[in-house]
Design a protein with these regions (language model features):
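N-terminal Rossmann NAD(P)H-binding glycine-rich loop of SDR-like oxidoreductase domains
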Residues: 1-24
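N-terminal Rossmann-fold cofactor-binding loop
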Residues: 27-35, 124
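NAD(P)H-binding glycine-rich loop region in Rossmannoid oxidoreductase-like domains
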Residues: 33-76, 91-95
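NAD(P)-dependent short-chain dehydrogenase/reductase
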Residues: 102, 111-153, 157-159
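Mid/C-terminal beta-alpha module of Rossmann-like enzyme folds, strongest
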Residues: 163-215, 222-236
Length: 236
């Protein structure tokens, strides 16, 4: 099995989850060794966790985002040898089709049809090597470019990675995140952040495919973010 984008936020967590399962011989693939591993042989499972997660960058650099998302997915499917293909995508492929980011991820998903493919749309995450996004903005009291009314299904990245590792034989499409939602305003107010929200952009991000009773509670993000704010205050 090969994980493309193994040094990224999701890719690193997924590589660790797969290694813990001891079920697979996992090959982490980054930019520097991409070609070496491409020509090394056939893989039982090829996981594409390399699509960038930079929404605002995508709007500013649509050509680059297309190359890193749509073109990369096509090249992986055509130029690597694999038996199963798992595409790590985003709920934005459904909710943000009015943006470059959402459209490109939806287009990449459409290449991944058939019984040998599985598309996982991830919702908002936290934990791990989290550095950017609405939670980082709230931790630093920066403006958040979404409405406080936005409902999101925050889930730990390690939990998401573990779920993917346990469902590699699935097919079709699944949206993965917390089983509940919390508004951005509820998170901000609970941790005492001074962030201000954009009034008109409601960015709802939560699964509409089936969730499970053992899936995370989105409100758990509050304790995580509160701890991050305390750690940041001590460091400064």
């Amino acid at each position: 099995m090969a994980v493309i984008g193994a040094t990224g936020y999701v890719g690193a967590a997924l590589t660790e989850a797969l290694a813990r399962s001891a079920q697979w011989d996992v090959v982490p693939v980054g930019r520097t060794d991409h070609e070496t591993h491409r020509t090394a042989g056939r893989y039982d499972v090829l996981i594409n966790a390399a699509c960038p997660s930079k929404r605002f960058w995508a709007e500013q650099h649509p050509g680059d985002d297309r190359r890193e998302t749509v073109d990369k997915t096509r090249l992986l499917r055509e130029h690597w040898r694999w038996d199963r293909f798992v595409q790590i995508s985003s709920i934005s492929a459904r909710t943000q089709l009015d943006t470059v980011y959402g459209r490109h991820r939806a287009e990449a998903e459409r290449m991944c049809s058939g019984a040998e493919s599985f598309v996982v749309r991830l919702g908002p995450m936290y934990g791990g090597d989290y550095r950017k996004g609405v939670l980082a903005d709230m931790a630093a009291d920066r403006p958040v470019f979404a409405s406080g009314r936005s409902r999101q299904s925050f889930a730990p990245v390690d939990w998401c990675a573990g779920w993917i590792a346990a469902h590699l034989e699935d097919t079709g499409l699944r949206e993965v995140g917390a089983r509940t939602t919390v508004t951005l305003a509820e998170v901000r107010d609970a941790v005492g952040s001074g962030s201000q929200f954009a009034k008109d952009f409601v960015d709802d991000q939560f699964p509409i495919t089936a969730t499970g009773p053992d899936w995370p509670d989105a409100a758990a993000v509050i304790d995580w973010l509160a701890g991050r704010r305390v750690s940041g205050a001590r460091a400064s």
